[in-house]
Amino acid sequence: MGVADAPSPGNVPVLGDMKNRSAAEMKISVLALRALTLVLLVIALALMVSNKQTQSIPIKLPGMASTIFLKKTATFSQITGVQYYVGALSVAVAYMFFQMLAGLFTILTTGSIVGSKSRAWVTFILDQLIAYLMVSAATVVAEVGYIARRGETKVGWNQVCSDFKHYCFIYGFSLVNAFLATIAFLPVVAVSAFHLFRMYGAQSAQSK
């Protein structure tokens, strides 16, 4: 190796500093994305649970000249799909809060964001499950919302958003936050997978 190819004395510290800085930035980014996901999930859940509207619906019965009005109240508990959405988001909120606390504790005690290999496996599997849960919940509610807005004439379902405009608006706002939470969480899922398989890559390199 010639003189020109020899590493300068400052190369190793500089590369080490860059690696440490990159690892620190990744830790902060993952925690920030988990926090953002948690906030969006809480907003989506709070909007759906608190969403309620009572409206007088005009009904004209056959053989009656006058129109009667029935009071109806729209809430999340009336539709099974929306109940699933509320339950799924509740689980996701609890998980995200726990993972944030566990992540902070792991960073403060070990300096790593994943800790041991077993912890990395648990995080990887649970992140995958929660991501699927969030996607399925948002998809179900999106389909229910579409039918509520457009109706389904083939099975005789009328659209109801013309009568419950405020409820449908809040419903849609909750759904938007749920999809944004899912988008924010996807990079976290990718990072947890990256950390797990990097552990096995490092172990394989050491054994050679």
Swiss-Prot record:
Cellular compartments annotated: Cell membrane
Entry's transmembrane regions: 28-48, 88-108, 121-141, 169-189
Main location per the UniProt record: membrane
UniProt-listed InterPro entries: CASP/CASPL (IPR006459), CASP_dom (IPR006702)
Extracellular compartment residues: 49-87, 142-168
Keywords in alphabetical order: Cell membrane, Membrane, Transmembrane, Transmembrane helix
Domain of life: Eukaryota
Example of a GO cellular component annotation carried by this entry: plasma membrane
Any matching Pfam family: CASP_dom
Residue numbers on the Cytoplasmic membrane side: 1-27, 109-120, 190-208
Membrane-topology descriptor: Multi-pass membrane protein
NCBIfam families, A to Z: A_tha_TIGR01569
Protein family per UniProt: Belongs to the Casparian strip membrane proteins (CASP) family.
Subunit-structure text: Homodimer and heterodimers.
Name listed for the protein in its UniProt record: CASP-like protein 2U9
Source organism of the structure: Selaginella moellendorffii
